[in-house]
Amino acid sequence: MLFNGTLICYNTKLAVGNADCLLQLPYSGPDFGLMHFSDMEVSMSNTERRVGTVSRGIRCPIIRQGDDLSEIVTTSVLEAAEYEGFSIRDRDVIAVTESIVARSQGNYCSVDDIAADVKAKLGGETVGVIFPILSRNRFAICLRGIAKGAKKIVLMLSYPSDEVGNELVSLDKIDAAGVNPYSDVLTLEKYRELFGVNRHEFTGVDYVEYYGDLIRSCGAEAEIIFANNPRAILPYADHILNCDIHTRRRTKRILLDAGAKAVCSLDEIMNAPVNGSGCNEMYGLLGSNKSTEDMVKLFPRDSRALVLDIQKKILDRTGKCVEVMVYGDGAFKDPQGKIWELADPVVSPFYTDGLVGTPNELKLKYLADNDFKHLSGEALREAISESIRKKDDDLKGNMASQGTTPRQLTDLIGSLCDLTSGSGDKGTPVVLVQGYFDNYTND
């Protein structure tokens, strides 16, 4: 048995436990007889934590339009804490996926709403649609609305891949064909002659064929070209919808400077209600997803009040001040498919004030291998802890901070939450992150 820190080893089993429980593990080593933990070199006291950052997916009910999301999130987190036996602490982060925020708001629009807005803003004749991402969920349904709002669509696809890395054709094929993607403009016929049919690695879709057929099915004429210079669209159309996400402002500026008559970005389509629809004043169609065959769920709007309300409810019920954020796509890149997982305009559109800024951290490996390479054991631990306690408020340029990921807190935590919650059937649209702001010195 084990009592008051005494470890007893038997010939065939190792018994480890305390006054309340006993765990027996297989053991085939020698009999060490009686041993006390006090005889062992232990570098951490009994009062210190053994766990740092913890990310938990929180199960919630299915969210419908009109639901009190603030109350549902608060209750779900507190019930999970009670059921699973953990406590809410100051500076915990409660993250809510953008999908359930938009669902609770009822922030939707239809394909016909998109068509009406495109026609009103770009004239309804020939429209150049440039640099869309290759996605059935993200863009195809928007393209249906765009095509219904014009007589002809000239679709200009970037190559060899779209903005977030979905590949139309491999770089090896580009090299073998002697094509310069920075300057060469390819017609559909030339593209097929050089590269044939190329299907997406994961979906099996030939997006060139798919997008062309979709445009024609909506009653518009379709012409497809391939180029990476925005100006390449101007011989074909002077009313342009640029569909890139993170480079949209530069693309629009280049087109207007080059003489385009009218240019809209996706954030300017559905940025106001159409026939009573939802909208997003800041991001328009950016961040939208397919809801049904004819409806689009837009990125959430006006959710600053939501994160503040959840923060207040948790404070009122637990006495703890937590941070709260709404998150969408994480900003990570898939090394297999080479896809940058950020089809939303931002990782987090709304968050509480404690999530502003970037981490200010020292690199433990650097300190251990350089400043304190002559130390070990408790002396090393205390020296590193003292460095952390006395670190400058701004470590930019300090060699001891190199490799510590100087990115926005919301991008880092939002990416962690996106990976935790998943995008399928986990049923955890809320994530609780604990210990993110702790360091090696926190007990």
Give a label for each model feature:
Residues 6, 12-23, 29-35:
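N-terminal amphipathic/hydrophobic targeting modules at extreme N-termini
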Residues 45-90, 99-443:
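Conserved mixed alpha/beta catalytic, RNA-binding, or beta-rich assembly cores of soluble enzyme
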